[in-house]
Amino acid sequence: METQQLSAGIGEWDILIQFVLGVVSALLGYLFMQKIRKAQNKNELTLNVISGMCVAGAVAILIEIGEFFIDFYKGTNLLHADLVTNDHWLYRLVGTAMSLDGQRYLLDMDEDMLLTILGGIITTAVMCIAVRIKNKNMFVRVKKEKLKLSFGKWAEKKFSTEKAKLLKDCSAFDITFWWCTRAVMLYAFIVWENRPEAILLCANLIATFAITLIHIVFPEGTFFSRVNYRAQTLITTIVFLGSYCGNYVWLYNIVPRFDLFLHLVSGVLCVMGGYYIALTLVKPDSKKNAIIITAFAALFSFFIMPAWEISEFIGDFIWGTTNQGFYWGPSDSSFLFKVFGRGAYNTTLYPLYDTFYDVLLAVVTTIPTVVYVYLSLTSEFKKGKSLAQSKEEKETVIC
């Protein structure tokens, strides 16, 4: 009885610690970005605040990676991979919906990441309100006379505006790729109409219209209405590879290393997604801004990693699927063992191997992509600066 009470007490403290960790991480992330370059306008301030949330996600996944390797090599149990209990607060909150007991081994890890990210998100929301109150002058909107347009005129104007943005942001290849993917996804949905997987396939099909829908719904001048249309190519790529090629064409089973390839690609796509979001708020017109954009792109990728694993956990929890691969038992020929060895032969970690394998693959491609983004931004800035200098020199000579 005393042992159960002690375990419950430790569990409650762990919940509090993880949440506070998310709060502190978000605050430090915001202060760090402000230190690199103090925000001069509301867009830069917004980016710095959102960066705090991304730092919370990065801290969540990096701590879990650290605990995994300590357990892997030392044979400890920091991740509580043997936790199998129906008394957990998550079960009390939503019930034991899952049908696969193997998922319970990932419960503590996903709980920690969820609480840390939740702390970061709540802190970010509070900071958004706080900085808006503190910096009222930055958020004063210039009132413009609004012309009263009929729905037809408004729709015509909106269509022409969005068409111009689309053609500016994207190439013919991007647009062709979108529609080809939508066509094959629609065909797959029709074929799978009576299967449970059809719901997920339909959701992924809708996701290929995400950026377009965002531009239509949100008014001109808002943050969401300025997101680069090329971000839709990133979403469509991951949907095409994961949902259509992986699940419908069944490449997960046909091609042995397809999952490895997909997670390597996801690291690149997440960095580029963060890059396009940052460009919506900050112009790459200085070296400090290049650092800010690159830092946000990296943090965004590290935020998506735990968020993705949590979404897989919730999906497995509700529908009894096996997205997190907790059934996987590694062999001596496993790529993970070839790279890191067998460690302390900690068999309780086996259900967690697939999750950390996926995360590590994404990290591998995130780092070089971040370096590429920074180098390309600085080279563009230097090129623009040299062009401006040569223009000034020509004007001086003429004078």
Describe the residue ranges of each PLM region.
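Bulky hydrophobic segments
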Residues: 1-323, 332-399
